[in-house]
Amino acid sequence: MDSDASLVSSRPSSPEPDELFLAGRNKGGGGGGGGGGGFTGGTVSSSTQSDSPPELSAELRSAMSAAGVVVVDKLGFKSSSSSASSASSASSKKDKKQMTEPELQQLRLKINSRERKRMHDLNIAMDGLREVMPYAHGPSVRKLSKIATLLLARNYILMLTNSLEEMKRLVSEIYGGHHAAFHPAACPAGMGAHSAPLPAHPGHPASHPAHHPILPPAAVSSASLPGSGLSAVGSIRPPHGLLKSPSAAAAAPGLGGGFQHWGGMPCPCSMCQVAAPPHHHVSAMGGAALPRLASDAK
């Protein structure tokens, strides 16, 4: 009796909807029957939502919302997005509520294992970083935290970068100064020091023919030749192309242009590496110097 009374009281008191309901019921068409069924379904859902328990109302709400969307599409009205979102949220809640206790426990275990693996990988990475970092391990140093390890790694990387830049600058300055000191065009005053070690071994010219990396054996052995021999060897080797100043050429008048440059350490540039003299210049040598050069070469 209570349900019938609630059903009667839920109907509107105005006669217009009742007449529309009877007119739609009397029609024999399928569309009218479908429309009447949809209208009655709407009234039943509106009457039973307030009287049903929460679980039943949630199920009826989700079912009637889906049915309402279909009816609206048939009648040609626009479907609202709020009803669709409420239906999806209700279905998701229903799925979660329908999960049994073992399934929920399995889901919790999967989530916990994934989180545990992530933290394990992070700890392994931090331990590897602490191993290669200075000041991060020792007998009197306790294990650093993750934030302290990252800050120490950042400072260490910045320090290494600054040290590398400073080392590059120093190396460039050292090699630049070395090249300027040994190059005759950049430093003409240093040619005397280059040519000074040559007369230091007058008695042993042939015993060390291969010590000089660039000069040929004949040119190295001619350091002990007096007077005419030196002038003849000077005629063999042309003057260095970089000796443009006359003062630099007059620094050692007894030696050729090539001997003014070559000293203890040769210049590494390709222009200073003079090739061996050609054979047709040897014919211009004097008769006294040629036998001595041949004996020195042996």
Swiss-Prot record:
It is found in: Nucleus. Residues 106-160 form the bHLH domain. GO terms for biological process: axon development; myelination; negative regulation of neuron differentiation; negative regulation of transcription by RNA polymerase II; neuron fate commitment; positive regulation of oligodendrocyte differentiation; positive regulation of transcription by RNA polymerase II; sensory organ development. PROSITE patterns: BHLH. Residues 79-91 have a biased composition (Low complexity). Keywords: DNA-binding, Nucleus, Transcription, Transcription regulation. Signal peptide: none annotated. GO terms for molecular function: DNA-binding transcription factor activity, RNA polymerase II-specific; E-box binding; HMG box domain binding; identical protein binding; protein dimerization activity. One of its GO terms (cellular component) is cytoplasm. Residues 1-60, 79-102 are annotated as: Disordered. Residues 26-41 have a biased composition (Gly residues). It holds the Pfam family HLH. Residues 1-13 have a biased composition (Polar residues). Required for oligodendrocyte and motor neuron specification in the spinal cord. This is Oligodendrocyte transcription factor 2. The lineage of its organism: Eukaryota, Metazoa, Chordata, Craniata, Vertebrata. The gene is OLIG2.
